[in-house]
């Protein structure tokens, strides 16, 4: 329970960035939903003190998100290493790596698990699924506009039963399957792909769904085919990476059953065409969408959405929804109409071409993964064992599998030998991590530059063995892993948290001989002193 006064007091005491605010107040260290508000309060208090509020994304880049986008686009930069070597410093962090990954995807739309891009991906984008509190993942196949055939429903049901997945219908008119272990994801998706499904991008800062009513095809009140348009929009914009997630909806009449006026892009049918609404939002701070244009034909509607979305991608801040973007846009909706509808900057055709390249280069990330044996090898809980994670336990509730409350399990036995050969060095992705077993103990191996580190795999403060799936980076030059669930920054050399707290992670000695990674069975006991 952190108040505005607590944040203001922290700023008065010298906390000048989000890392410092999180460390001394613990604000925005839970679900992260309040991060934008905390940042706004911090910046307001800094400005009240006469302190210049910098828009630098983090310590590694003295640039705003908009500036990074233009650096990437204008200079044809295709990798994080190219960008940081020319315009940044250090090794990156949990802020700049996903940000740059998103910008690169928005510009060039390359496969996220290419070796140059994999280290930038947070766990959801790295494994193309949404991580849950116990370290398992949820799977969401695409159902454009909520349409699904009887055979498709049967296939989903059979897959859920076969892999003991909890099934739930989402607010976006599709089905979410919970509880998939990391190593099960490829098999689940191979069956889904065989049944005609593709990824629903529920894990990405991208288009989620285009919700719709049944429209004029079935409904006596419908005046246009809302489902048909929603299917077209969803297939056009699927996979589009943006500063934040994008939700759309299409209603077939003014009764508004699809709730289009609460979406980033909303479309409502009229007798003459379609009304376009923009920058609506539900969630923590609801915002009613603005009427942007009326009675558009379908071609003009799509052209307007193309331009608006690409302009949003160019100009929004990091993790800024369209609703907040609009509220902070000088000139508001009138200015946006000038840019998009009247082409006041003369960039309309350019924005359309950028969108066309994204549409033309679409790929189902899971289909690409299933066709690549090297990428499939990354989808395993342990690089040297097929044994499943013993911490993942289930019981039945309301006829479905549910996670058991977390309990402390006895730690696995360590090997009797002083050193255990774990894997080949090349089995650990560069600048990333992978899970392993030291005897029966779960550990995380990290390949940072030319060194390999080993820590316990349990994320502090959780019951999930997921630390190996965290991002690697540095804090003031100190190599760290950023935990995937709660974004805790943990030093690689000794397992100590960088942001305060005394709950350390055990570290284990590592050596690399003839391309083989060995881990010692005697943990590193002493806390390493800061150099």
Q: At which residue positions do the language-model features occur?
A:
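Short flanking/linker segments adjacent to small metal-binding domains or redox-active Cys/His motifs
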Residues: 33-47, 82, 88-106, 307-331, ...
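Flexible, glycine/charged-enriched surface loops at secondary-structure junctions
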Residues: 80-82, 98, 112-116, 165-171, ...
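Local cysteine-cluster metal-coordination motifs and their immediate loop/turn environment
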Residues: 1-8, 22-43, 54-65, 88-101, ...
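C-terminal accessory/binding modules appended to enzymatic or scaffolding proteins
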Residues: 1-18, 51-80, 133-135, 151-156
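Short Fe-S-cluster ligation motifs
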Residues: 17-41, 54-76, 87, 128, ...
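Rieske [2Fe-2S] iron-sulfur-binding domain
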Residues: 427-531
């Amino acid at each position: 329970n952190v108040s505005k006064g607590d944040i203001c007091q922290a700023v008065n005491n010298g906390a000048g960035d989000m890392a410092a605010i999180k460390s001394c107040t613990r604000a925005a260290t839970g679900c992260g939903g309040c991060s934008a508000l905390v940042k706004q309060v911090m910046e307001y208090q800094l400005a009240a003190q006469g302190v210049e509020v910098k828009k630098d994304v983090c310590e590694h880049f003295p640039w705003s998100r908009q500036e990074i986008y233009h650096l990437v686009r204008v200079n044809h930069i295709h990798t994080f290493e190219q960008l940081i070597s020319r315009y940044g410093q250090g090794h990156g962090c949990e802020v700049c790596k996903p940000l740059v990954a998103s910008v690169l995807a928005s510009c060039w739309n390359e496969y996220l698990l290419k070796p140059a891009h994999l280290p930038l991906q947070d766990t959801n984008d790295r494994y193309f699924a949404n991580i849950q509190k116990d370290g398992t993942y949820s799977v969401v196949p695409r159902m454009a506009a909520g349409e699904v055939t009887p055979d498709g429903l049967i296939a989903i049901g059979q897959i859920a039963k076969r892999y003991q997945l909890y099934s739930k219908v989402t607010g976006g008119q599709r089905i979410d399957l919970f509880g998939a272990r990391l190593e099960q994801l490829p098999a689940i998706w191979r069956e889904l792909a065989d049944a005609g499904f593709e990824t629903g991008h529920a894990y990405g800062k991208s288009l989620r769904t285009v919700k719709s009513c049944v429209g004029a095809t079935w409904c006596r009140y419908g005046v246009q085919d809302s489902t048909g348009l929603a299917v077209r929009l969803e297939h056009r914009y699927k996979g589009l990476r943006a500063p934040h997630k994008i939700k759309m909806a299409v209603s077939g009449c003014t009764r508004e059953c699809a709730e289009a006026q609460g979406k980033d892009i909303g479309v409502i049918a009229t007798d003459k065409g379609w009304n376009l609404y923009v920058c609506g939002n539900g969630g923590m701070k609801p915002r009613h969408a603005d009427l942007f244009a009326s009675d558009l034909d379908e071609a003009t509607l799509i052209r307007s959405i193309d331009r608006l979305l690409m302009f949003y991608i160019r100009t929004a801040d990091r993790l800024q929804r369209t609703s907040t973007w609009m509220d902070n846009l000088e000139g508001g909706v009138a200015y946006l109409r000038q840019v998009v509808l009247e082409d006041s900057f003369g960039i309309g055709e350019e924005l359309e071409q950028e969108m066309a390249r994204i549409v033309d280069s679409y790929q189902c990330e899971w289909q690409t993964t299933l066709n690549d044996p090297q990428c499939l090898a990354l989808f395993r809980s342990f690089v040297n064992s097929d044994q499943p994670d013993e911490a993942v336990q289930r019981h039945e509730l309301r006829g479905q599998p549910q996670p058991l409350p977390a309990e402390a399990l006895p730690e696995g036995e360590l090997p009797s030998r002083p050193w255990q050969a774990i894997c080949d060095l090349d089995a650990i992705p560069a600048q990333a991590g992978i899970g392993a077993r030291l005897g029966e103990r779960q550990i995380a191996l990290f390949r940072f530059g030319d060194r390999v580190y080993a820590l316990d795999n349990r994320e502090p403060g959780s019951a999930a063995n997921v630390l190996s799936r965290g991002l690697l980076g540095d804090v003031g030059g100190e190599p760290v892993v950023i935990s995937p669930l709660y974004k805790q920054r943990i030093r690689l050399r000794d397992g100590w948290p960088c942001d305060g707290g005394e709950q350390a992670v055990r570290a284990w000695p590592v050596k690399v001989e003839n391309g083989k990674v060995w881990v010692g069975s005697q943990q590193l006991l002493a806390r390493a002193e800061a150099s």
